[in-house]
A protein has these predicted regions:
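Membrane-interface helix termini and inter-helical loops of multi-pass transporters
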Residues: 1-8, 35-39, 66-70, 115-127, ...
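Transmembrane alpha-helical segments that form core, pore/gating elements
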Residues: 8-9, 20-23, 87-88, 124-179, ...
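Helix-helix packing/entry segments at the starts of transmembrane helices
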Residues: 12-14, 76-82, 146-168, 201-237
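C-terminal transmembrane-helix exit sites in multi-pass transporters
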Residues: 22, 26-27, 83-105, 229-241
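Hydrophobic transmembrane alpha-helices of multi-pass small-molecule transport proteins
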Residues: 23, 99-119, 136-139, 171-172, ...
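Specific transmembrane alpha-helical segments of multi-pass solute transporters/efflux pumps
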Residues: 27-74, 79-80, 116, 197-215
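Loop-to-transmembrane alpha-helix entry segments
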Residues: 44, 80, 96-116, 125-131, ...
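Hydrophobic/small/kink-forming positions within alpha-helical transmembrane segments
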Residues: 54, 58, 62, 85-89, ...
């Protein structure tokens, strides 16, 4: 319900900036004193990876919104879940890391569950589905590189801070290029922006980053696929869908 009066780029730009503002005092209080100790390892790698995960998150979000103009919700929901099998495949080819066989049954069950949950068996393949698959690639890369950066640098809030700022800036640029900027529309969506910005754009992504310090990318992707289940329950309970 957050894009009734403003476009998706502007919505993401504002909500991720809200997330940035919310995280900033937590960073100053909890992590600022640890920066020198952590970044002495390889500051260039830290900022490169933190910037990259922001770009991946922006591209995943943007392509998901664009694809909905050319496909339906069931297709988008199902093909987005493709990031689950993409994670171990990309990890293997990019970093030559072998994936334990026990992960694959769970990956297959995730795809099967997504197939049933989204009613994809009643869907028709559309031209926008390729965009959704590309979107899933960026979600997979986001999960993988979050795992890489947090395992080397114990600065989850700073990583989240950089990520939200990158997404906000790129989204605002997208809004300027592709949308009409409606300031009054932002105020009309105040509650939705605050909700999505504080809980999702801010805290949820930092919790993801923190959690991935102790878990490899493939199990992380499997766990994150529960988003579809929770979204279905929330849509039924909160929106009567």
């Amino acid at each position: 319900t957050g894009m009734e009066f403003i476009g998706p780029y502007l919505f993401n730009g504002v909500r991720f900036f809200v997330g940035f503002l919310v995280l900033l005092p937590f960073f100053l209080y909890f992590e600022k004193k640890n920066i020198k100790k952590e970044l002495v390892k390889d500051s260039n790698q830290f900022f490169k990876y933190s910037f990259l995960i922001g770009v991946f998150l922006f591209l995943g979000s943007a392509l998901q919104q664009i694809s909905l103009q050319y496909t339906d919700v069931a297709n988008a929901a199902f093909f987005t879940i493709f990031y689950v099998p993409m994670v171990p495949i990309i990890v293997f080819f990019l970093f030559k890391e072998k994936i334990h066989w026990s992960n694959w049954p769970s990956v297959i069950l995730c795809l099967l569950g997504g197939y049933l949950l989204t009613n994809f068996y009643d869907a028709t393949i559309r031209k926008g589905d390729a965009l959704v698959v590309l979107c899933a690639v960026f979600w997979a890369l986001h999960i993988i590189y979050v795992g890489k950066v947090i395992k080397n640098f114990n600065l989850p809030i700073l990583i989240g801070l950089i990520q939200t700022l990158v997404v906000s800036i790129l989204s605002i640029i997208g809004a300027i290029v592709f949308e009409e900027i409606k300031i009054d529309g932002i105020f009309k969506q105040t509650y939705q922006i605050l909700y999505a910005g504080i809980l999702s754009g801010g805290f949820a992504f930092v919790l993801q980053i923190y959690a991935q310090k102790n878990i490899t990318p493939t199990p992380a992707a499997i766990i994150f696929s529960l988003e579809g289940v929770i979204a279905t329950i929330a849509a039924w309970f909160l929106l009567n869908q």
